[in-house]
UniProtKB/Swiss-Prot annotation:
Residues 540-608 bind DNA. This is Meiosis initiator protein. GO terms for cellular component: nucleus. Residues 157-167, 453-465 have a biased composition (Low complexity). GO terms for biological process: activation of meiosis; cellular response to retinoic acid; meiotic cell cycle; oogenesis; regulation of transcription by RNA polymerase II; spermatogenesis. The lineage of its organism: Eukaryota, Metazoa, Chordata, Craniata, Vertebrata. GO terms for molecular function: DNA binding; protein dimerization activity. Gatekeeper of meiotic initiation in both male and female germ cells. In complex with STRA8, directly activates the transcription of a subset of critical meiotic genes playing a central role in cell-cycle switching from mitosis to meiosis. Temporal expression of MEIOSIN is required for meiotic entry decision. The gene is MEIOSIN. Residues 412-430 have a biased composition (Basic and acidic residues).
Length: 638
């Protein structure tokens, strides 16, 4: 019985290769425990049932491990996808010191998707309105009006209701089916017109519908032709007045994907839809779409603009001259102030008259105005706004009407008129306006200036001009204004070509304070340079004597022979050796010293014995001198 149970237990044991190491140990331990607790009295069926239960538990545990591993992978996959979405958000992922949680990131992603969907809906609303020509023909985006019966039939199918209309790019505003035959006959007889690539041309005259067309539309729903100045409600058929056509009507322009541009009027399209469908709410939808278009115009990074040509020969009022020539594409000229399409251009009230460069060149007046005029009044310490213009910015000579000249005044009478802001300064002054110095003063390059003063070129001037240069510029200017007539003491200041306002803004005052501090720091150096007289010729140095030449030639050798000796100690030892040397031994060193002094322009004594043709004798070797010093001195020298 016991042997059979062991045999059965081993036969029911699971395979080793299908279990992990932990599972394998559990099975072995359970089998061993079962063998230890074997009771011969227990029935054979109970032991088999326990083994089968253990085997089922192990199988369930393996299945759970397999299920957990894909969940971890899936969780990691979701986290990585969420991080990729978070990188697409136009916000920072950190708020202060905390990071955004996964839930917050998901909420931001959903809000961003809703924002994008709203913009997509606004863009679709633009493409719902497609082009119908003034004569009543149909044309899609980038299509000619008469291209064949098949395409005309496809575009002339009516729409069932406003809710079922689809916004496709190549569709057109739908018209009733009853006018299909009349429109086909008219489009066949009409000559095709070339497409326009820009909407700068003036709109053509709108042709009123023919009498037979009016008659055909009396029985059913009739669609009045679009009028150029319609604003969301139907109007009777009428052509634009000649005055509007002369000024050039600004209509909404759209570009298709093939870069073909055509004239489009949003409100007129909704007019046709409202009459066609006999529904009360298309006008409200038109107002919503117009608001969307206005929002899209403000949020576009590069809004499409329309160039309005300025012609000085035409009779234009002052308001049109003040207007910015780069007008938005959505602004009709005849729309009232309360219209949602009205976008008032920025008004610049400094340009008037005809023949201005902004009119001749067709450029924006903001290019010709000084940025100093746009500064707030809080920056200015007084109400003279032209001071900021002259101090901060340089006006180029394109402007015929400029602020008071910040340049050279040839006579004191012109100085008095400088504060009155002359409207027509002479051209000789306006030709020299581009030189800028680092101290915020604008120097003139005119030839009339005889003595332009600057702090760097005042080395040869008198002491009075140096004192005036060291003073702050605004003090010099106050002195000049207090004494406008040219006095002998201020003649140099009258000829000065700089002009500085009496009161400057705070940035200029700070800059001048720094410059003044730099001048004060450099002030003690200037008098020293001035007090120095003409430099005398350089004094000759003393002659090099024989002992100095002896030390130069033998000091290193002595230090090599006695390593560790200091240079001063070596000099003392050489001095003792020099005292012991005879005149014959010293003579070569003295001769070499005199030659060295003559070569280097030093003072040399004119002795009768010394001559230029002194023979150079080889000195006694140094080691021999040292050996002789080591010997005891002769008795007559002791």
């Amino acid at each position: 019985m016991f042997g059979s149970s062991r045999y059965l237990g081993s036969s029911e044991q699971p395979r080793a290769n299908s279990l992990g190491p932990s599972d394998r140990t559990l099975v072995l331990c359970s089998l061993v425990e079962g063998e230890d607790k074997v009771n011969p009295s227990e029935p054979h069926g109970l032991r088999m049932e326990e083994k089968w239960l253990l085997k089922g538990k192990l199988r369930n545990q393996r299945n759970q491990n397999k299920l957990l591993s894909p969940n971890k992978k899936q969780r990691k996959n979701h986290t990585s996808k969420l991080q990729e979405l978070a990188l697409l958000l136009p916000i920072a992922l950190k708020t202060g010191t905390k990071k955004l949680t996964k839930k917050e990131i998901l909420v931001h992603v959903l809000q961003y998707i809703q924002y994008l969907q709203r913009n997509i809906d606004a863009a679709k609303a633009l493409f719902k309105c497609h082009i119908t020509t003034g004569e009543g023909g149909l044309a899609g985006l980038g299509q000619k009006p008469a291209w064949g019966p098949a395409r005309r039939r496809r575009h002339s199918t009516p729409s069932s209701s406003p809710s079922s209309q689809k916004s496709c790019l190549q569709g057109a505003c739908q018209k009733p089916r009853k006018k299909k035959l009349t429109q086909a006959s008219e489009s066949q007889t009409r000559t095709p017109k070339p497409r326009r690539s820009l909407a700068l041309n003036k709109p053509e005259k709108l042709v009123a519908p023919s009498p037979d067309q009016k008659g055909s539309g009396t029985g059913g729903t009739t669609t009045p032709p679009r009028c150029p100045d319609s604003c969301g409600h139907p109007r009777p058929a009428s052509s634009s007045p000649p005055g509007d056509r002369k000024g050039g009507q600004s209509q909404l322009t759209l570009l298709d994907l093939a870069e073909d541009t055509i004239h489009c009027d949003i409100s007129s399209c909704w007019c046709q839809g409202s009459v066609q469908d006999d529904a009360p709410f298309p006008a409200l939808l038109a107002q919503e779409d117009v608001a969307r278009i206005h929002f899209l115009n403000k949020t576009q990074p590069h809004p499409r603009q329309k160039l309005v040509f300025y012609d000085s020969s035409e009779d234009v009022d002052k308001g049109s001259l003040d207007a910015d020539p780069w007008l938005p594409a959505w602004t009709p000229e005849n729309s009232p102030q309360g219209s949602p399409l009205f976008l008032g251009p920025p008004q610049i009230d400094v340009w008037s008259g005809t023949g201005h460069p902004s009119e001749i060149l067709g450029l924006s007046p903001s290019l010709f105005s000084s940025p100093g005029k746009l500064l707030p009044d809080e920056i200015l310490e007084d109400d003279m706004e032209y001071l900021t213009q002259a101090a901060f910015f340089e006006e180029v000579c394109l402007d015929l009407e400029s602020s008071p000249s910040a340049y050279t005044q040839e006579a004191p009478q012109e100085k008095d008129t400088a504060s009155k802001a002359p409207k027509d300064p002479p051209e000789s002054h306006s030709l020299h306006r581009s030189s800028v110095s680092l101290d915020h003063c604008y120097l003139s390059l005119s030839g009339n200036s005889k003595a332009p003063s600057s702090s760097s070129s005042s080395s040869s001037s008198s002491s009075s001009s140096e004192d005036s240069d060291s003073e702050p510029l605004w003090k010099q200017r106050e002195d000049m204004q207090a004494n406008p007539v040219g006095t002998p003491g201020s003649s140099e200041e009258d000829e000065d070509t700089t002009w500085t306002p009496t009161r400057l803004a705070s940035p200029l005052l700070a800059a001048e304070k720094k410059a003044t501090k730099g001048q004060v720091a450099r002030a003690p150096v200037k008098p020293k340079e001035k007090k120095k007289g003409p430099c005398p010729p350089q004094m000759k140095k003393k002659c090099v004597n024989g002992f100095i030449m002896f030390c130069r030639m033998n000091r290193k050798q002595y230090i090599r022979s006695c390593p560790g000796t200091a240079s001063t100690a070596a000099t003392k030892e050489l001095a003792q050796l020099w005292r012991v040397m005879t005149q014959q031994e010293r003579r070569p060193y003295c001769t070499k010293a005199r030659r060295f002094s003559r070569q280097h322009n030093r003072i040399v004594k004119q002795d009768g014995s010394s001559s230029e043709a002194e023979d150079w004798e080889t000195p006694k070797p140094f080691y021999q001198l040292l050996a002789e010093k080591a010997l005891p001195l002769p008795p007559h020298l002791q």
